[in-house]
Amino acid sequence: MKKLIALLVFSGLALAGCGSHQSDTKTSSSSTSETKQTTTSSQDASEQKKLEQLRKDFNDAMTNENAVFPQLSNEVAEDEAVVKITTSQGDITVKLFPKYAPLAVENFLTHAKEGYYDGLLFHRVINNFMIQTGDPKGDGTGGESIWKGKDKSKDSGTGFENEYSPYLYNLRGALAMANSGPNTNGSQFYINQNKADISSKLPTDRFPAKIIEAYKEGGNPSLDGKHPVFGQVIDGM
């Protein structure tokens, strides 16, 4: 197993905290009911807004010849962060995409800055598939997000939500969250390292032409939509 010796953050993000205001605890049942209904309505509206934006982004990714897929460039944009993962097998430089996966990037960078990942093992190494780490237990059963026990709006106890973007995919070199199902993201992550060309198997009505071309270099499209991609290796594969 490959040992993760240290993770050095070269550029980070400003992390914003959220406060809460508590009113008088003596409230009527009708008031409580109204509050719950308002909260539910707000959540529904928020989810609807996310869905509409996702549809717009998907249409753009599929039809716009000038659509930008950040993984396809080794250049680091102003809205991206860069980290270097130092391992016993060499350094891996990764650029992160907070614009498309803000929760995953914030979680990763915060853990890195606090030393959470220092000394951990790549406990799961599968040739022509991926390498996985981020578990303090070292066996794939541990780890948690930075919000567990602190912010139930982001992690109710089982992990934070999946972030999906039609601009990010599990290409070779992609950094993504390891999880046990939808919205169960904690601290574990993996790097795709499959080299096989499987582009011919990808449906053209689901994958943008540029991404199908990129999958000729390898990757794991079967993981798309299940494991949030939030970074891409730009040196050290």
Predicted regions and their residues:
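Cyclophilin-like peptidyl-prolyl cis-trans isomerases
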Residues: 18-237
